[in-house]
């Protein structure tokens, strides 16, 4: 199915209040002014992602939300762990992995192409494809920026390329990091 339209602010408020209660229950000290500002921004922005998804992808169905990846890695005894914010499937049979990011104004070209930022999606794609036995050519990755302080265009979705070479580089970097931790 599709994401519901019209009740996003209510859903956000309920979820936000539950998270705040959990933090308070855990003994976290919160600054009320920041909590209030954050809630106001969230209510304001809550209804914007669904229309942005429809505009960007046209017809789509939600394949999964907050999908847990806990997948074996090749050549090491570790598991890859991650949570994919949203996966939609479009009429052409492609899967689109979407990672939501909040920001004040957006990202510049350097940030959009920074391997340390984009490798997250590359690794999600690799492990999602293996988990579901899907050809990686049928999976695309995207960042969706929710811009809190923008005057217009509060949601920006853009594709991040992640072919075989980039996947190889991301896996190599991850394995090197794991080796250095041992």
Give the label of every model feature segment.
Residues 1, 48-51, 96, 123-130, ...:
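Residue-level signal for well-ordered alpha-helical scaffold segments within enzymatic catalytic domains
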Residues 1-68, 72:
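A non-catalytic, helix-rich entry segment at domain boundaries
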Residues 17-20, 25, 97, 103-106, ...:
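Short amphipathic alpha-helical segments and their helix-coil junctions
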Residues 33, 52-55, 74-75, 108-112, ...:
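Short helix-to-loop capping/linker segments positioned immediately adjacent to catalytic or ligand/cofactor-binding
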Residues 37, 116-119, 123, 169-176:
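Generic recognition of stable, solvent-exposed alpha-helical segments in well-folded globular domains
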Residues 61, 93, 137-139:
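Residue-level signal for beta-strand positions within conserved beta-sheet cores that form or flank
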Residues 64-122, 128-129:
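Non-catalytic protein-protein interaction segments used by genome-maintenance enzymes to assemble
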Residues 126-182:
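Metal-dependent nuclease catalytic regions and adjoining charged, substrate-binding loops involved
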């Amino acid at each position: 199915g599709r994401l519901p339209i019209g009740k996003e602010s209510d859903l956000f408020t309920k979820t936000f209040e539950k998270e705040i209660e959990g933090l308070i229950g855990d003994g976290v000290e919160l600054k009320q002014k920041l909590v209030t500002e954050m809630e106001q921004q969230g209510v304001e922005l809550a209804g914007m992602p669904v229309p942005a998804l429809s505009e960007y992808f046209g017809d789509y169905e939600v394949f999964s939300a907050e999908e847990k990846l806990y997948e074996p890695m090749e050549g090491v005894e570790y598991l890859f762990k991650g949570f994919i914010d949203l996966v939609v499937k479009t009429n052409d049979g492609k899967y689109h992995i979407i990672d939501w990011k909040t920001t004040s104004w957006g990202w510049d070209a350097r940030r959009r192409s920074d391997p340390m930022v984009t490798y997250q999606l590359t690794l999600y794609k690799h492990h999602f494809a293996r988990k579901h036995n899907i050809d990686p050519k049928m999976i695309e990755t995207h960042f969706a920026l929710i811009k809190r302080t923008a005057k217009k265009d509060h949601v920006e979705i853009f594709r991040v390329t992640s072919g075989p070479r980039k996947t190889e580089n991301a896996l190599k970097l991850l394995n090197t990091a794991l080796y250095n931790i041992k």
